[in-house]
Amino acid sequence: NNIGYVEGAGDVVPESLRQIGYNVTIIKPEQISPENLTNFDAIVVGIRAYNIVDELKFKQKFLLDYVKEGGNLVIQYNTNRRLKVDNLAPYNLKLSRDRVTDENALVTILQPNHPILSFPNKITTQDFEGWVQERGLYFPNEWAEEFTPLLATNDKGESSKQGALLVAKYGKGNYIYTGLSFFREFPAGVSGAYRLFANLLSSGKENLTELKN
């Protein structure tokens, strides 16, 4: 499993993924090209990359084309102010200040049979036990109908937030946007967070496995 990682504000996600057996390559912004991206099974974008990496405004087209051609793009949280790109996603996606600060907040699985929640790991509410600090932050609160929200969660007294994990088919690939705080859960060794992230990285591969079998 070759994973390309575009760094943002700095997080331990690349090292965490290496520890569980992924081959992770850091991709510098200037290395984002159609040729280079084809080497990877999935591309992950680090936290707040779209707030701080100027070059992404020129490279976003290549990342979205990578998805269109069958790639798997996983974007972690960005703040809703001062984005470097107008087209964060291939479809309308609007970030908000929505967050869930209670790390034990109930998580409802909206699409239990969705491939991302089924392969290779069957994700259940148990995978959201033992999280630290928060569930996530800066969730999108508006999105195009092409997106499927997979989870709902909220702090006490707040409305249900369904923007924590959104997936959209684009061309032959999958675009995934998540405000879940994987960057906090990995250092704490939260197994459910690892299991879910493994599914994000495998998105689109479930059919290949069926063909092999």
PLM regions and their residue ranges:
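Extracytoplasmic/secreted envelope proteins and their assembly/folding machinery
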Residues: G10, P14, L37, Q60, ...
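Extracellular/periplasmic catalytic domains that process cell-envelope and extracellular macromolecules
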Residues: N36-T38, V67-K68, S159, K169-G171
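Aromatic-Pro/Gly-enriched surface loop or interdomain linker
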Residues: N1-G46, Y77-T79, K94, R99-D102, ...
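Short amphipathic C-terminal alpha-helix that caps PH/PH-like domains
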Residues: G192-G204
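Catalytic beta-strand/loop cores that center a nucleophilic Ser/Cys/Thr
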Residues: R99-V190, L208-L211
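Alpha-helical scaffolding within the catalytic cores
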Residues: P29-I32, K57-K61, S159-L165
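A glycine-rich, often tryptophan-bearing local segment used as a flexible ligand/cofactor-contacting loop or short
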Residues: R48-E129
